[in-house]
Amino acid sequence: MTSATIPGLRGSDGQAPTEHSELLAWVQEVAELTQPERVVWADGSDEEWERLTDQLVEAGTFKRLDPKKKPNSFLALSDPSDVARVESRTFICSRSEADAGPTNNWVDPAEMRATMTELYRGCMKGRTMYVVPFCMGPLGAEDPKLGVEITDSEYVVVSMRVMTRMGKAALEKMGTDRPFVKALHSVGAPLAEGQQDVPWPCNDTKYITHFPEDREIWSYGSGYGGNALLGKKCYSLRIASAMAHDEGWLAEHMLILKLISPENKAYYIAAAFPSACGKTNLAMIQPTVPGWRAETLGDDIAWMRFGKDGRLYAVNPEFGFFGVAPGTNHSSNPNAMATMEAGNTVYTNVALTDDNDVWWEGLEGEPDHLIDWKGNDWYLRETETLAAHPNSRYCTPMSQCPILAPEWDDPQGVPISAILFGGRRKTTVPLVTESFDWQHGVFMGATLSSEQTAAAEGKVGTVRRDPMAMLPFLGYHVGDYLDHWIQLGKSADATKLPKIFYVNWFRRGEDGRFLWPGFGENSRVLEWIVGRIEGSADAEETAIGNVPRAAHLDLDGLDVDPADVDEALAVKAEEWRKEIPLIEEWFEFVGDKLPSGVRDEFEALKQRLG
């Protein structure tokens, strides 16, 4: 089939839906390479959603849920081999290997393009090729960050409508020549004539490849989440971090929270935690401290740049939440539950109840019988395997969140007063520490550490360094990335920089129990952080930073022994001396590009510890 005979290449009526010549040429080039049966330009309309979801139900990919309980919502079960991000098959193909750095997989870009071009040849035979224009962040931005994903997966088109500002409006924003990120995706499962499709097509060979200088993403073989929804980690973090480095801003793996004091003053906080450390729960916190309220602007990604007034402003580039389902319930995160229960949600790899609803571990009420994520019968107290996959997901529109901040769609973003780093540590790291200054805060972020959880490859429980929680998402050298943070701080007005804090909700006593109750009670720590911003809260200067005592926190009405809180806040020199060689080992791994400012902070810490 020549490109001239591929139906839909020039739009449904033969009139090209855009005059963007670079986009039209790229669509034609990809169609000629991948040989789809037809081309469809996605418009993001309700009609398109209805058509595609009906098609997915008919194909057996989607199961329509009970419209009374979960209106306009669907369950998808993936192939058991295609369930998570694959860090081992994720590549940063910068032109020079030195620019990828020690934390990324690198292949020469020319070699990678040749390999993947052969994989893409004819890979969409028998399928529809969708052209999906989208915008990351508000469409009204001065410099909108646009993208086009070409995909052969209806699941991807439907999910991109939830997760991004997708369709006709984004295409119009591109005009005739605006730059855009090219994101090419195929499940890698061509269909021969008359061949029966499977509910979840994918390929054992997988590549998730980024060409940072060319602003291109090539993904092959996976239909799942971050491997296939290329606006998410691939664009918003890996490609955007490279853009941000070139253009003088920050693309970060952070939630954005709006905290409102009893005096009705708003404070905006960005926070970076690795997977499974409570980012979504903090983003949607219900404060337990009387008079305090919280609203959310995002639970995963923040793009931050300095405004004309010298303050750092953040926007969330996403349009939906793509959250981990297990552990989410009406007490741990009532706002997330309300968001998805409003409908228009796609669930992946959770369990199905007998009355056509969804269930996962940690959700209230254990049913006697389920269909598990592999499509098998599951019986309470009899079946030994999990009903939902540990990385099962909900994909739901942000606009449905009951505590969504009104500024969520403001292209100017919100001014950030505090940046939090944090991880999951049983020992050593106090509940909260304030950095001495910006550079010391960058050192804190550079040495962020967390015990491995089921959300990442690797042995559960081992401590892994995860700089700014960006380890799997850096689009360039980690040393250059840390230096970018240092330089941005140096060029800013120090009095207007956000204060930087490090939190650890997960410290345990010698008997193994958690010393701090977490969840909504974390608002007591946030209240102290606001007090430090305002200069009204006390702290003790320690070797690692400024740390409160239990008496400095508002513990009214909290059923926790103040001695436990003091233990959660304790800075123990002997534990920190054990940390020193671990940090040294990490800095050796980063190599020659470790910024001198970060090294200076490390030397100063060693001296303070004596």
Swiss-Prot record:
Binding site for substrate: 85, 224-226, 275, 391-393
Chain positions recorded as Mn(2+) binding sites: 233, 253, 300
Name of one Pfam family that matches: PEPCK_GTP
Compartments where located: Cytoplasm
EC number(s) on file: 4.1.1.32
Top-level EC class as recorded in UniProt: lyase
Top-level lineage group: Bacteria
Cofactor note: Binds 1 Mn(2+) ion per subunit.
GO biological process terms on file: cellular response to glucose stimulus; gluconeogenesis; glycerol biosynthetic process from pyruvate; oxaloacetate metabolic process; propionate catabolic process; response to lipid; response to starvation
PROSITE patterns for this protein: PEPCK_GTP
Catalytic activity, as annotated: oxaloacetate + GTP = phosphoenolpyruvate + GDP + CO2
Molecular function terms, GO-annotated: GTP binding; manganese ion binding; phosphoenolpyruvate carboxykinase (GTP) activity
Cofactor: Mn(2+)
Example of a GO cellular component annotation carried by this entry: cytosol
Catalytic residues in the record: 277
Pathway(s) annotated for this protein in UniProt: Carbohydrate biosynthesis; gluconeogenesis
The entry's keywords: Cytoplasm, Decarboxylase, Gluconeogenesis, GTP-binding, Lyase, Manganese, Metal-binding, Nucleotide-binding
Chief subcellular location: cytoplasm
Subunit description: Monomer.
Family per record: Belongs to the phosphoenolpyruvate carboxykinase [GTP] family.
Protein name as catalogued: Phosphoenolpyruvate carboxykinase [GTP]
